[in-house]
Amino acid sequence: MNRLDHIGIAVFSIKDARSFYENVLGLAFLHQETVEEQKVNVAFFQAGSVKLELIEPLTADSPVHLFLEKKGQGLHHIAFLCNCLSEQLQALSDQHVQLIDRFPRQGANGKKIAFISPRETNGVLVELCEPKGDQHNEHE
């Protein structure tokens, strides 16, 4: 868990936000997908060795919709790669770290993901992600 993978930014509309990241910042658009389990659409951009993820809620009961209502658009989370998410979650649990997810769930790009409570991380939502087998060495 020593490498930053991506930074998640909550937006009301990917379509409206995309132009800034592509045309103003000059970031390369990678792809867009729907993550049904999270009730969001996401779009990824390459920013050096890190990706930016724009996150748009699909429904009013999406956690991202609730985040946007409470805090508005902006930084949603930072995500770190880990080799074995299940083992990492167990190690954190053994250290009494408060987790949002005790078990991995499905995220974008086929990754397994889990979140650490912001109460543990000075108010920052931290995501841990384990890439699919063929993505472990991506951008290294």
Curated annotation (Swiss-Prot):
The keyword Cell inner membrane does not apply. Keywords: Lyase, Metal-binding. It comes from the Bacteria. InterPro entries: Glyas_Bleomycin-R_OHBP_Dase, Glyoxalase_1_CS, MeMalonyl-CoA_epimerase, MMCE/EMCE_epimerase, VOC. Residues 3-131 form the VOC domain. It holds the Pfam family Glyoxalase_4. A divalent metal cation binds at residues 6, 53, 77, 127. The keyword Lyase applies. GO terms for biological process: L-methylmalonyl-CoA metabolic process. GO terms for molecular function: lactoylglutathione lyase activity; metal ion binding; methylmalonyl-CoA epimerase activity. Belongs to the methylmalonyl-CoA epimerase family. PANTHER family: METHYLMALONYL-COA EPIMERASE, METHYLMALONYL-COA EPIMERASE, MITOCHONDRIAL. This is Uncharacterized protein YqjC. The lineage of its organism: Bacteria, Bacillati, Bacillota, Bacilli, Bacillales.
